């Protein structure tokens, strides 16, 4: 089954925040983080969307190793929804509240 891939507009802001951190801390790592994101979203998740660990009810995530960032997504029969890029040390309750509010309607 081929599912439609949708990326929430908020993901751009999430990536910008991560890139801003690395612009100061390790600018040579920005391309690496971006490439891992693209690989996760365009290859790894679509190939096996249920293979990655649950994050919250109805949501899964894949870490962009070796970074501490992960991609949060959900799947339906019709689509794979990429909802956020978050740092693994963020407050889980705050992350869940924000992610659950991100819709495509």
Curated annotation (Swiss-Prot):
Q: What is the lineage of its organism?
A: Bacteria, Bacillati, Actinomycetota, Actinomycetes, Mycobacteriales
Keywords of this protein's UniProt record, alphabetized? Toxin-antitoxin system
Role summary: Toxic component of a type II toxin-antitoxin (TA) system. Upon expression in E.coli inhibits cell growth and colony formation. Its toxic effect is neutralized by coexpression with cognate antitoxin ParD2.
- InterPro entries from the UniProt entry: RelE/ParE_toxin, RelE/ParE_toxin_dom_sf, TA_system_RelE-like_toxin
According to its UniProt record, which protein family does this protein belong to? Belongs to the RelE toxin family.
What is the official name of this protein in its record? Toxin ParE2
**Top-rank taxon, per record:** Bacteria
Is NAD there in the keyword field?
no
Entry-linked Pfam families: ParE_toxin (PF05016)
Q: Name one GO biological process term.
A: symbiont-mediated perturbation of host process
């Amino acid at each position: 089954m081929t599912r439609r891939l949708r990326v929430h507009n908020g993901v751009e802001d999430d990536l910008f925040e991560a890139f801003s951190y690395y612009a100061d801390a390790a600018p040579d790592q920005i391309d690496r983080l971006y490439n891992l994101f693209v690989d996760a979203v365009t290859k790894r998740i679509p190939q096996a969307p249920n293979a990655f660990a649950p994050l919250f009810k109805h949501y899964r995530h894949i870490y962009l190793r070796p970074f501490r960032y992960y991609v949060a997504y959900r799947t339906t029969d019709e689509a794979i929804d990429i909802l956020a890029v978050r740092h693994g040390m963020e407050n889980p309750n705050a992350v869940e509240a924000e992610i659950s509010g991100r819709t495509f309607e």
